[in-house]
């Protein structure tokens, strides 16, 4: 568990300690509205806006039509990280809203179905690898966009639905590990 992390002496943990400085890229559809929805500011983290503002799923999905980061430059980001001394980067593959920065074949809620269309995650993995920076993935085990996700299991129907969600999650994780084999680890939230 987390209480034993400080005692680990294995090579992977030692490398993580030796890396010392890293970057964390927290990016998703929530970056478009930031912390504001319908003229109201919500304090705290923008990635929770959909939940805090109780935004209906169909309304949130409309943000995909605006997702077009044409000025995004993965190589520039990776160069800046290297210049600041980062030895690793943690990239959000998807946050709780379920929007995938890679073209997942298991959901339509993905960058492939936006005006940008490109595999942002793939661009970042390549750019950071090219700079000699280890890439780690953040992956939300919550997914507000998936119909079978459950906060709690209250019935047999919930249990069956959540089993389908677990299969979906397993498929996405296998997909990420296969598409991006140089990734060093996953951080589950």
Regions found by a protein language model. Give the residues of each.
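Mature catalytic domains of secreted/periplasmic carbohydrate-active enzymes
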Residues: 1-189
């Amino acid at each position: 568990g987390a209480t034993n992390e400080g005692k680990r002496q294995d090579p992977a943990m030692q490398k993580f300690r030796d890396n010392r400085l890293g970057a964390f890229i927290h990016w998703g559809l929530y970056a478009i509205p930031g912390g504001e929805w319908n003229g109201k500011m919500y304090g705290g983290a923008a990635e929770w806006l959909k939940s805090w503002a109780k935004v209906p799923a169909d309304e949130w999905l409309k943000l995909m039509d605006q997702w077009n980061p044409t000025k995004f430059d993965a190589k520039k980001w990776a160069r800046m990280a290297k210049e600041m001394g980062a030895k690793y980067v943690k990239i959000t593959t998807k946050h709780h809203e379920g929007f995938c920065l890679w073209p997942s074949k298991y959901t339509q809620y993905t960058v492939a179905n936006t005006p940008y269309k490109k595999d942002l995650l793939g661009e970042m993995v390549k750019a950071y690898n090219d700079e000699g920076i280890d890439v780690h993935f953040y992956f939300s085990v919550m997914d507000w966009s998936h119909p079978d996700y459950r906060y709690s299991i209250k019935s047999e129907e919930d249990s069956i639905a959540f089993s389908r969600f677990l299969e979906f999650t397993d498929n996405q994780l296998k997909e990420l590990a296969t598409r991006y084999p140089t990734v060093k680890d996953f951080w589950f939230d």
